[in-house]
């Protein structure tokens, strides 16, 4: 049994070698010749999986170690009798922590408290729900918009997008990319929406590049609209609008979900799905794969305020480390993908062990996802 895996999927060789012969290959472009005798294909979002790639090939199963699936033609796979699995929620925590790192940086730079801001969350799936929970744990007001969930009657106080635009100081997008249909998200943030944002608002896109109309956004910024922008995703990736990058406050190369934990979850989820597909079901404990974190433990004295939270968050991950490298190589062919391929190891907040002498600080840090304990000062 031959299994092709994206060369940037951590732990893929280690896990899939339990099931057969493993060949690691580039994801963009994928070497088509390798598909001629392969039984399974494990990809990331950079690989377009469709009829033109797989027609006439012996592939029986496709797995994507990503939450999103807009790069996969699921309907064609089903029609062709090819098994499929994604990894929903695998990088949700990573994306939430990316958003927090960005917001805390902007709050420090511009001198505002997040408690004074209302956050509008567009898309309330695995990422949106977790973001809502962590923001509300801090006492930050949130507004939710998710028309598909609202129409299904899912639990939640869902508002219209117009309401979020009118009332939110921060608007952050966490939707799939739907190019048509009743829940179309292509250019959901169009020129009209962008121009309607509150003066000084913050716009964040960490889902799919085309959810925000990049051309319209650049036009508004060039005209002097007072707006802070965080973009992790771009229309036309791996190409991007260099002029837009110059205008945004934070720009990164589609790495919001790139924690070691998130990547490992993606790999293990598709590994477990494929092992079940072939009748050799196996389960993997994530902590048996992950290395020890860089920081063993730290001690926190007193209450948890915003500056202290910012220091803790940026101790684990400061978004500026990914902004600067992209600006240096923007516009150079191949460099966007190279940054992603050679991405420095990044951990989640849970890797940081925090000893607190204040019980409320320990409790709040646990709600936020840190590994915190209370030890009263002696």
UniProtKB/Swiss-Prot annotation:
InterPro entries named in the record: D-isomer_2_OHA_DH_cat_dom (IPR006139), D-isomer_DH_CS (IPR029753), D-isomer_DH_CS1 (IPR029752), D-isomer_DH_NAD-bd (IPR006140), Erythronate-4-P_DHase (IPR020921), Erythronate-4-P_DHase_dimer (IPR024531), NAD(P)-bd_dom_sf (IPR036291), PdxB_dimer_sf (IPR038251)
Transmembrane segments: none
GO terms for biological process, alphabetical: 'de novo' pyridoxal 5'-phosphate biosynthetic process; pyridoxine biosynthetic process
Positions bound to NAD(+): 146, 175, 232, 257
Pathway(s) served: Cofactor biosynthesis; pyridoxine 5'-phosphate biosynthesis; pyridoxine 5'-phosphate from D-erythrose 4-phosphate: step 2/5
Active site location: 208, 237, 254
Function: Catalyzes the oxidation of erythronate-4-phosphate to 3-hydroxy-2-oxo-4-phosphonooxybutanoate.
Family indicated by similarity: Belongs to the D-isomer specific 2-hydroxyacid dehydrogenase family. PdxB subfamily.
Annotated Gene Ontology cellular component terms: cytosol
Location of the protein in the cell: Cytoplasm
Catalysed reactions, semicolon-separated: 4-phospho-D-erythronate + NAD(+) = (R)-3-hydroxy-2-oxo-4-phosphooxybutanoate + NADH + H(+)
Pfam families: 2-Hacid_dh, 2-Hacid_dh_C, DUF3410
CDD domains to which the protein is assigned, alphabetical: ErythrP_dh
Organism: Escherichia fergusonii (strain ATCC 35469 / DSM 13698 / CCUG 18766 / IAM 14443 / JCM 21226 / LMG 7866 / NBRC 102419 / NCTC 12128 / CDC 0568-73)
Enzyme class: oxidoreductase
Name of protein: Erythronate-4-phosphate dehydrogenase
Top-level taxon: Bacteria
EC number: 1.1.1.290
Residues given in the record as substrate binding sites: 45, 66, 258
Record's subunit section: Homodimer.
Keyword annotations from UniProtKB, A to Z: Cytoplasm, NAD, Oxidoreductase, Pyridoxine biosynthesis
Molecular function GO terms recorded: 4-phosphoerythronate dehydrogenase activity; NAD binding; protein dimerization activity
